[in-house]
A protein has these predicted regions:
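N-terminal secretory signal peptides
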Residues: 1-27, 38-42
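Acidic, glycine-rich loop-and-strand cores that form catalytic or ligand-binding grooves
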Residues: 192-245
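Low-complexity, Gly/Ser/Thr/Pro-rich intrinsically disordered linker/tail segments
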Residues: 266-315
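Second-shell loop/turn segments in exported
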Residues: 137-144, 159-160, 259-260
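Conserved oxyanion/phosphate-binding beta-strand-loop segments in alpha/beta enzyme cores
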Residues: 101-130
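N-terminal module-boundary/linker segments of secreted carbohydrate-active enzymes
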Residues: 55-103
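Conserved hydrophobic ligand-interaction patch in extracellular adhesion modules
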Residues: 150-213, 273
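Twin-arginine (Tat) signal peptide motif
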Residues: 23-33, 47-54
C-alpha cells in the first residue's frame, strides 16, 4: 500500500449527517441497513477524494464523539447497571457509547492484511482497519469490555462508521495480533448474561494482560468470541452469529454459530469494529461494496459474496 494512500485513509473525516441516517433507519430495519450502507460508503469516499493528504483530521474514528471529562468510568458504569434488566442495560450501553464514552486507545486503528489467491495464480490483497480491542465503556485507566446484543452492536457500528467482521477477518485479526490471550471460560449458566460475569471476566483479562506484559493499546485477540456477519443469517433472521475465541491459529473454541437470538449477549462475546473503508488492490473501497463483489469478496470472506444488509439478519 502506497504511503500517500495510507496517509489519506488515516486522515479521513466523515461529513455524513447521522440525523438523516437515523431517520432512514427507522423507516425499515432491513431497508434502513441498505440505505445506511449506501450513504456511509458514498460519504466516506467523497470525503477521502476531497481531503488533502496534509490535512490531519481525526481519522477513521472521526464519527465517534469525544469522551466527556464527566463520563462514567468502567467501574461506575458496571455499578450503574448491576441491578437492571437486560433491556435496560442494552439501552444504557447504547447511550454511553453514542456519547463517546469509550477509551481513547480504541480510536487508534490497527491495519490487518488479508489475501486471496485466484485460480490464475494472482493474489489479491486488502488491508482492513480495526479497533485494537473489543468495544469497552470507560477511560483508558478504568474500562469495562462490554458485550452487547446484535441490535446494539449494529446501531453502534453504523453510528461510528464501521461494520462487524466476517469469520475470515476474525481469523486474520488473531493471526496479526502480537498479543494473543489464552481463553478463560467461566462456568456456564444463566449467570453468563449477568453484569457481574462481565466484571469478573474483564478482571481476568486484565490480570492476564498484566502478567504477560501486553503493551497498552496493542492489537489483542483470543479473549472473547466475536459477533460476526455471515450469510447464514439470511436463512436465520432474528439470530446473532458468533465465532472465535481462539486457542491458537485455526483453532477457535467457538465455531460459527447462529443458535442464539439477536437479543442475546453473554460475558464471552466481544464487539470488534472494522472500518467501513478498506484498501484493496491499491484503491480505497467500501467494505460493503467489496463484500458484494463476487471476486473481491473472497479476500474478506470465506463465504464468498455477502450482502451485509441480509447478513445482519433482523437486527
Amino acid at each position: 500500500m502506497g504511503q500517500a494512500l495510507y496517509e489519506l485513509l488515516l486522515s479521513y473525516n466523515s461529513s455524513l449527517s447521522w440525523t438523516s441516517l437515523s431517520d432512514r433507519w427507522r423507516l425499515s430495519r432491513r431497508n434502513g441497513i441498505k440505505l445506511a450502507f449506501s450513504a456511509l460508503c458514498a460519504g466516506s469516499l467523497r470525503a477521502s477524494e476531497t481531503r488533502d493528504e496534509s490535512t490531519q483530521g481525526p481519522g477513521l474514528t472521526g464519527s465517534i464523539p469525544p469522551r466527556s471529562l464527566q463520563a462514567l468510568t468502567g467501574s461506575q458504569f458496571a455499578d450503574s447497571v448491576s441491578n437492571v434488566d437486560r433491556q435496560q442495560r442494552e439501552r444504557a450501553i447504547l447511550g454511553q457509547l453514542f456519547e463517546g464514552n469509550l477509551p481513547g486507545f480504541l480510536r487508534k486503528l490497527a491495519p490487518v492484511k488479508l489475501t486471496y489467491e485466484l485460480a490464475s495464480g494472482k493474489t489479491l490483497a486488502a488491508t482492513i482497519f480495526v479497533v485494537p480491542e473489543y468495544l469497552a465503556i470507560g477511560s483508558d485507566h478504568d474500562f469495562l469490555r462490554i458485550p452487547m446484543n446484535l441490535h446494539t452492536a449494529v446501531a453502534i457500528a453504523n453510528r461510528f462508521g464501521f461494520v462487524l467482521p466476517t469469520k475470515k477477518m476474525v481469523d486474520a485479526i488473531y493471526d496479526h495480533s502480537p498479543c494473543q490471550f489464552k481463553p478463560q471460560p467461566l462456568p456456564a449458566g444463566p449467570q453468563m448474561m449477568s453484569t457481574e460475569y462481565y466484571r469478573v471476566h474483564n478482571a481476568m483479562i486484565e490480570k492476564q494482560s498484566e502478567t504477560r506484559g501486553f503493551p497498552f493499546g496493542a492489537l489483542v485477540s483470543g479473549h472473547k468470541k466475536d459477533v460476526v456477519v455471515t450469510n447464514r443469517l439470511t436463512k436465520r433472521p432474528g439470530q446473532i452469529a458468533i465465532y472465535g475465541w481462539h486457542r491458537g491459529a485455526g483453532a477457535p473454541i467457538q465455531p460459527l454459530s447462529t443458535v442464539h437470538g439477536a437479543g442475546y449477549a453473554d460475558y464471552s462475546h466481544g464487539i470488534r469494529l472494522v472500518s467501513r473503508l478498506a484498501m484493496i488492490e491499491g484503491r480505497l473501497r467500501c467494505v460493503h461494496d467489496i463484500l458484494q463483489d463476487s471476486v473481491l469478496a473472497n479476500v474478506l470472506s470465506d463465504e464468498g459474496a455477502i450482502r451485509l444488509a441480509s447478513a445482519y439478519g433482523a437486527a
